[in-house]
């Protein structure tokens, strides 16, 4: 029997607030909690024999990119790895791949942010945002990804909007468009479309 890929699910920067409280401080929103779509996906994949990691960056909403990189450097990533990144986590994965030159099986970006997010005058800037988004993602990254890049978006996402469009020609990405998922908050309990894309 063929060995399953290992999967890394990476959260975003959790800038969202609920009743004035940062989402990152709500236990349900821990990426490993089975009550949200990321933890649910991890559980489903593990039941099917995948090795899955949902790493957590400490104080993520104010963490420098170097803290993300240090965490990613500790993970097992090889040509059988599937990387999944939400929002800023998607950008962090692309930047890290660009810097390390590692090859992976597949990359799935969910509501991906890009360096263009810093150009939005209406949003509150996160700490170290300019430094976080300092790397230019180029089309040469495609050579490090064996299968097609997949981007999952929701039509009603008000956080990154259409920012994903720059990645489509750059990475020859296929887009999966969903309805009523917003910015894929961890208040969403399941994301079967992601589970399906990982297993393809």
Question: What feature does the model see in each segment?
Answer:
Residues 102, 112-139:
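Flexible "cap/lid" loop of the alpha/beta hydrolase fold
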Residues 63, 181-192:
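Catalytic histidine-centered segment of alpha/beta-hydrolase-like enzymes
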Residues 157-163, 186:
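Conserved alpha/beta-hydrolase "acid-adjacent" motif
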Residues 2-47:
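Short, surface-exposed "cap/lid" segments of acyl-processing enzymes
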Residues 12-13, 57, 108-117:
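Active-site nucleophile loop of the alpha/beta-hydrolase fold
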Residues 84-94:
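Gly/Ala-rich beta-loop-alpha elbow adjacent to hydrolase catalytic centers
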Residues 145, 150-153:
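Short beta-strand/loop motif that positions the catalytic acidic residue
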